[in-house]
């Protein structure tokens, strides 16, 4: 006798997944109206485009030369402005990464902060993650800075600040970030609204 048992937990998971998907879509659609009403913020579509662009840039750079195999590349895009950070083996690879990135369709501007040298250690990357979280939390906590509009990336002790902000907001963000112990330098990669 062939008896099929139904797994009730599978139906429950399917229901939960559908509910989560529905809520996510609803949140995104609601957010479209919120983001679209202020030209100083990125829309959800631009945020997705930036994420896709980051992956595309890294893939194209790595495909362009086998010398990138041991490189540590950090690619960050904010509104089509692309930050290249990390370490590569030679100045030639540093310049090539810049050229490859500039040749991509949705890239508006490239900030090449790649350094020539070996990749950073796990300990250095852990410290970078800690610095990023400290800077980001201070920016969000500061009432004078619109911290949610500023993206923070740290590489080898250098904090990069990206965003769509006024010059006053940029200066305040640098002031707030400079009070975090352990960072070596701050680089502004902002697009200014004024």
Model segments located where?
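N-terminal targeting leaders
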Residues: 2-194
